[in-house]
A protein has these predicted regions:
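Mid-domain alpha/beta scaffold segments of enzyme catalytic cores
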Residues: 1-45, 49-71, 75-80
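Divalent metal-binding pocket/active-site signature
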Residues: 44-52, 57-144
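Charged catalytic cores and adjacent phosphate/nucleic-acid-binding surfaces used
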Residues: 1-28, 36-39, 92, 115-133, ...
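Exposed alpha-helical structural elements
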Residues: 31, 65, 80, 96-97, ...
Length: 221
């Protein structure tokens, strides 16, 4: 089995959060390390605010509960809150938590201003990596907004999108394969695996990329 270094960066674009994956990055690159540090600094404050918001909804001690699921407190996320809420009986599963409490616009959601798309792509590229838009099917953009996102991403030096991912349905595999063809993107796969039972698919069960698309990792492996 072969491995690549990687990073996933949260980005604010058109008032929504998207994720940009960097593959084959140099983890010691100064620009990347400093950029990630700035991004992490806002994560803890947001998590505390989410805990306060959930308390107003009758879910006390959520921040402390979420921390029990975190190996690195600097990396606390909504998923850790979701695990606490499922374990504590407030929801049936992680998706139920996001649908009812923590998804965009839901009563426990707290917005955060993440990095700019241009900054994230720059950090990835100067560290020797290639930028990939992660699981585009998760983002609630209009077709016009998606076209603008993809065009800007290309202008900034972005190379690929995730086509086959645990966050996509089979119909979305086909949809984003067509996007890759239309924009000339290379393609990537990602399980988006966080824990057993939390996603649509388990590790090792994703189908391959369509044979006519170029895998982004071919240049390294």
């Amino acid at each position: 089995m072969q491995y690549l270094s990687g990073v996933e960066i949260s980005v604010t674009w058109a008032s929504r959060t998207i994720h940009v994956v960097g593959l084959h990055v140099d983890p010691a690159c100064k620009d990347l390390v400093e950029g990630l540090e700035r991004t992490r600094n806002g994560r803890a404050a947001r998590a505390e605010a989410i805990g306060e918001q959930l308390a107003t909804l009758g879910i006390p001690d959520a921040y402390a509960g979420a921390l029990k699921f975190v190996s690195n407190p600097d990396m606390i996320s909504r998923t850790h809150f979701a695990r606490f809420m499922v374990e504590s009986g407030y929801a049936e599963n992680t998706q139920d938590v996001f649908n009812r409490f923590l998804g965009d616009g839901k009563p426990g959601y707290v917005a955060h201003r993440w990095s700019k798309l241009a900054d994230a792509v720059k950090w990835i590229r100067v560290s020797g990596g290639e930028a990939v838009i992660a699981h585009p099917g998760r983002y609630a953009y209009t077709q016009t907004e998606f076209d603008a996102l993809f065009a800007e991403f290309i202008d900034l030096g972005g190379k690929a999108i995730e086509v086959v991912t645990g966050s996509h349905t089979p119909d979305q595999y086909r949809e984003y394969a067509d996007v890759a063809r239309r924009f000339g993107f290379e393609a990537s796969r990602g399980s988006d695996f966080h824990a057993a039972g939390e996603g649509r698919v388990e590790l090792g069960s994703l189908p391959p990329l369509p044979s006519d698309l170029k895998p982004v990792w071919e240049r390294w492996l």
